[in-house]
């Protein structure tokens, strides 16, 4: 019998899954094919289960609140007594109770498709529920059931805004179940963080949970076993911030565990020689500004890398006196200048970062949101600050690091939901042992896809976008214009201003009124320009007039580096059976072509039309392959590092 709620022995002080050994390519290949039957078996949803939940719920609907509370307490007792094997009948009872409590508290009862999605999560799978199908509500079935069974549940969201919003929305429902709910907010004190993680159900972004885990690792040192943890809790009287990794449900799981998994999570502190570091960053920037591409260095935009030529190395040797003494040796000065060139040529303001209050703030390329208190590693952040002429912060010393892949595999039970999992199904299985389950839609989609338009010039594209938005807005339809960067949002806004189209902008540079902008985006005739901030977890509610006029129209102005992100943007329209439409208006000057288009991209763009569209599609696929390879390389390096350090003691 498989475990619905697997767990370690009841006496385990810090429950978590054991670290897995690194796998060779041969091991991965063998595992891929020998485990295929198990993958298919776990990916088989049971429609009969949903029917039983709906049927059982009819009896609960007739009960008073007091009697329903008694049923909840009895269900919790039965679930905890069953330990890891609650059985189908107990799960049906729990789902039906949570569904009825949701109806009374939120005015919403789960559909059969939401029940199927939550059941797949309990099976340890990724439930692919189309955008607009109510994943946030569906998660409460799995989270509430696991918490009633005595498991500490972490609901991982794509960003901090969604964590706070969802926790506030669902707190009343969990209270009806006798469960506590909290959200972990960035910048909270250790005491507030510890209190939040003590709740039965915790909503937090993946980065917040992972960095809390790293802080605990640093605090516990080599005492990672139960005895060491108990000893620490006894003597310092505080214990750890994060009481184990038992049960995780990841909302928008492809964003959290695929897109964000290309860079490791690093916990660091400032160094002692900060002033010398700043001097070196300024000197490296000045030298890099004098070097020329082609003669002194070569850019590899595909790998985001810089390679110095022989001439560049010789020229750098002549200029080494400008560097502080400790940075003059060839390997160190060359690395510093390569980083400075990367800051100048490969990292652009209002695309990769913004300047706010004299500080460089990184923009998450997948969510479009600012990542406060985050910095690039290996001196890149200081190089960008030198380029922008702002105060240079100190390069930080690494205390601990881990990849998202290795972190999430430490959860005893892992599952999640997203609207776009199919493209990453193989990676979910090979890295996380998670099959993908496709859940049918509750209502037939009424979203229409219009023909893609392609221009040779970006200026022509923005003029077309503004013209389309003006016409649709005049007809009473709300319009959402999706952009990749802050700079692109400003270009779209300028084109709309030129035609006198009233609109609002939502981007990393203008995020203060996010909730208000989203709330108004579904009004009849509203025009909204947004980066990926409006691409995930955003439900644009249509008013009656907008619905009658034809619903929301989404305009994608650039292909992203992943088809999944494009699908998420398109999914803002036509949700829950609403009318809607989507189209792409692109250009040969879109940033995907120079980054991933290959050597013939500039030649192809001369022909325009279908040739440019084919080149953009090929560039997108190349970007996806590059990112898959980068994530695999990162995981292999992380596993190898963990193995090499294992002789010093248990690394966690």
UniProtKB/Swiss-Prot annotation:
Keyword set includes Nucleus: no
Q: Where in the cell is it found?
A: Cell inner membrane; Cytoplasm
Q: Which GO BP terms apply?
A: intracellular protein transmembrane transport; protein import; protein targeting
Predominant location: membrane
Name one cellular component (GO) term.
Answer: plasma membrane
Q: According to its UniProt record, which reaction does this protein catalyse?
A: ATP + H2O + cellular proteinSide 1 = ADP + phosphate + cellular proteinSide 2
Where, by residue number, does ATP bind?
114, 132-136, 539
Please give the InterPro entries that the UniProt record associates with this protein.
Answer: Helicase_ATP-bd, P-loop_NTPase, SecA, SecA_CS, SecA_DEAD, SecA_motor_DEAD, SecA_preprotein_X-link_dom, SecA_SF2_C
EC main class here is translocase
Topology versus the membrane:
Peripheral membrane protein
This protein's record includes keyword Translocase: yes
Gene Ontology MF terms in the entry: ATP binding; protein-exporting ATPase activity
- The EC code for this enzyme is 7.4.2.8
Q: Which Pfam families match?
A: P-loop_SecA, SecA_DEAD, SecA_PP_bind
Keywords, alphabetical: ATP-binding, Cell inner membrane, Cell membrane, Cytoplasm, Membrane, Nucleotide-binding, Protein transport, Translocase, Translocation, Transport
Please name the SMART domains in this protein's record.
Answer: SecA_DEAD, SecA_PP_bind
Protein family (similarity comment): Belongs to the SecA family.
- Quote the subunit structure annotation: Monomer and homodimer. Part of the essential Sec protein translocation apparatus which comprises SecA, SecYEG and auxiliary proteins SecDF-YajC and YidC.
Write out the function statement from the record.
Answer: Part of the Sec protein translocase complex. Interacts with the SecYEG preprotein conducting channel. Has a central role in coupling the hydrolysis of ATP to the transfer of proteins into and across the cell membrane, serving both as a receptor for the preprotein-SecB complex and as an ATP-driven molecular motor driving the stepwise translocation of polypeptide chains across the membrane.
Q: What is this protein called?
A: Protein translocase subunit SecA 2
Q: What is the lineage of its organism?
A: Bacteria, Pseudomonadati, Pseudomonadota, Alphaproteobacteria, Rhodobacterales
